[in-house]
């Protein structure tokens, strides 16, 4: 039996040879398929057949479950009567009937996927019936879907993905995520994640190879990022640093140059040594712009000879985007080239493949596409393979057509074959892509495209968004038509979205254009939430009042869809204001904020944030000026004036010129009515003025357009007849032209005109007004408020209410009298005054050209993702800013660890945060004076913060991001070298300490356990704990060290876990480290695994709570309030309390320290007079109040390590252990490890204290251990850890080949 995808046989199970019936025939997704040709020949109704099959299956299942139901009921009646809900209820019971109900649900799903084009309402009911159990259902049901696709060639997976997408679009829910949660691999497969990752790693490997063979320079891998001679202060690392950076590889790796190897850098590796595996990031792809539009930037034509011709387009969108796209040949443009898959012809082709009397040659493969032989633009198959709505077999046909294999000649020589291949469509497209940005066609089904473009986009969305409801096609009054066309719109948007995501890399910016593709952002974000997607609406956004009621089906998804873009650009403030207004009305849960300084609205809805900006589009000035300034154009303009106005025109004669598409939005009919009224009101202008109207005919196939155009043409003829006069026999009041003008002719008309007329009813921007004034600065301008350019000019002060007005405004194009008056004012305006006004307009347009427009939109600085510069006045401002930088740093760390290049807005955010802090500092210092809160009066003592460390950490992070994005695979060493300036002694001392530390880490090679303190060890002390955000570079280094050099890693700190604890200030992703807070008394392993020391009695915790409350009350007193923000402030840990009485910079006077110390001791004495439960311990920076352990001692980090070991069943008696600390509180941690494993401990101490060094040395020697290193600052420890990460590959290799020298 021939297998045909998607069609099932529903006959009852027939007895097998042994007399038993085969259950396979009754199982959904596993039934045999009937032959398509026999069904077509018999004329049977496929939909009815499949529906009857599904009906019988559900009836059989319901009867098996004991449900009474009318066996004559139709499939729709069964569904409407709650058939799916009943099946779902039985399935959820998880009893003996569940499997039967499950098979019934599969039958419904199978039917829905077979007819995904026309059973969307059934699928919605199906998903709703599953309720909160969709994940469980998909987990059990998707294997059946996959099995059918693999065994029978169906496309159920694609149908399921689209059906869920349509469901989410229409309902505003996120059910597609549930499918991804149930079957994680389906999303990766759909997006080609593994293929992308392979490409990135291959690219990285090529980079490494190219670096190793670079140009014969001794600099080799230590080349600076920037040439010092060219970039001056921009340098990050200079050439003179090469030798110093080279030292970081120490004695383990050296670089030598083979003079006979054409400049290749050879690595000489000593016995037992390691060679570097690369830097901290493993991809080097740079950001691209992926432009997505309905229309392509080119036109394709097939000549009669069979050769293809491709021409760059000249439309408005191409002019707008070309400057930014042409910068990088890796940029990509996705568009529909006008040839799509014809579903009916696909079926014919399908039958050809299955018929013995037909072969592929019997049906030309071009017939599958909506193209003709003489103009058949075809799309490469690479963008359609695996995409929904398209059979995979068709990919071979598409490629066959594109390569034009069917026209190759017999016995042609190689030269002829090369010429033929170059002139084939595939060759033409490849040639275009070699010399331009990449053009990638998007192929969809022809029937869908016709409905999407010629139907709902132009018949509903275009007039609706222009607020011209009278031009909405009447067919959309029918809910069924609206639904069908809306589904086609979603399907085409889905196809564009899939193509865009599959062709994108994580660092790319995807730019979607115009009203055809308003849902792509929502669909793309459901596939990959990390994408950065912008959308620009080139037309107005002014839907009529009934849009959200009469056309609710598409209105609400469009609103939600636009809010799923990262940022949305509008042409005018009018359009954005309307959108924000409608969001407030129809999406009341959305939160809208406005940044007046940046003029940006941010809308947060359903967990997504979207920035809304205004970007008036413009023109490429130089393209028009080049033509306008040529002698040929100037002469042509003079000839035009003479031809129209005569050789000797009247002095006051005026040529009015207007050019636009013949579209009802352009107000051509209203213009003609006003022009007739002009002569009626001002008969003295008869015989003088001429209106030259160019209305380029388009969309004649649409009834509303054809009727409108015919009416206007008739009106033009009537005007010429009505005002013809014998006094001026050669004068014609109106020239009406319906064909277009080439650019040179257009510019000549601009030069010839006296007054430009641009008066649309509603328009996005209308660039004609700008073209006119750029070419002819002395011309007058009649401009309607319907044009976006008029709004832009008004906001620029070019038409003030009181003052000099630079153009003649038409407020209401339907008011013929006022419209006529505007004509008259423009006609009689003195030439000098008119020229002055035109010059002002010209200057404004010249200063706001198209490059500024595209650059402004792409600028990451206006997105809500960016931290903007802000004024820091009080503590809340300061801490809020630092927490925002924590979020940014976490994203940086995560992206680097995943090998995803860093977006530019991260650097902008950190730079803006740094500048905000610098501007808030006292003049000439790095000290902040902040109010505790804005409510405090002026007499309240401000908080003082020395933020030198915070500013340094910002600088290091900014430096880190420059290195991490470099193409040099040795960016680790380069970054380490940049840290030397932060060493408290000298750069030489920094290098010596890093080398010594690196040698110890290399000797240990790999650690079974890594226990470390945080503050003072891995990070310098901050001005206060909430500000001690872990820098991004530190997070990356620590995570990579945990990944490559250690097995079990734990950060043990005296800080609390949460509520401004160690988890709040960390930027390392979960899974790399365990966190032991309160000296290891409470542990965070992962969100599902947290534990505490259970030995503390409840009454002791209550006692500690009383102490904490008393100290909190003390800090409310004005005399002591400033201790709230000194250092770590007041912190409640599990088992102890910390109150800072001095900061790291000794800025608190000694008498204040003594005063608060005494107050705290008084509180302790009052609550625990005998100190039976509490013990006070003072340090230089704080007072710690501990609950005594069962032994009566203070719980320390050594006990914290033992608690972890006991709970996690760790064996620290074997293997190697790395311990890092900086103070006496870390000594118990070291001692606990030495007691368990004396010879396996390696320890690093960040200290310059000789006393502490002696204590550590004596402790290690007591256990016979000599594996200790002392460093002066956290930067050295991090540098050594970073150096250790490049030892991922540890291989003992022989030296150079013996024959090397002879060679």
From Swiss-Prot:
EC number: 2.4.1.15
One annotated GO biological process: trehalose biosynthetic process
Compositional bias per record (Low complexity), positions renumbered to this chain: 212-221
Matches recorded under Pfam families: Glyco_transf_20 (PF00982), T6PP_C (PF21141), T6PP_N (PF18572)
One CC-aspect GO term: cytosol
UniProt cross-references to InterPro entries, sorted A to Z: Glyco_trans_20, HAD-like_sf, HAD_sf, T6PP_C, T6PP_helical
Keyword terms, alphabetized: Glycosyltransferase, Transferase
EC class: transferase
Catalytic activity: D-glucose 6-phosphate + UDP-alpha-D-glucose = alpha,alpha-trehalose 6-phosphate + UDP + H(+)
Protein name stated in the entry: Alpha,alpha-trehalose-phosphate synthase [UDP-forming] 2
Organism: Aphelenchoides avenae (Mycophagous nematode worm)
Lineage: Eukaryota, Metazoa, Ecdysozoa, Nematoda, Chromadorea
Gene coding for it: tps-2
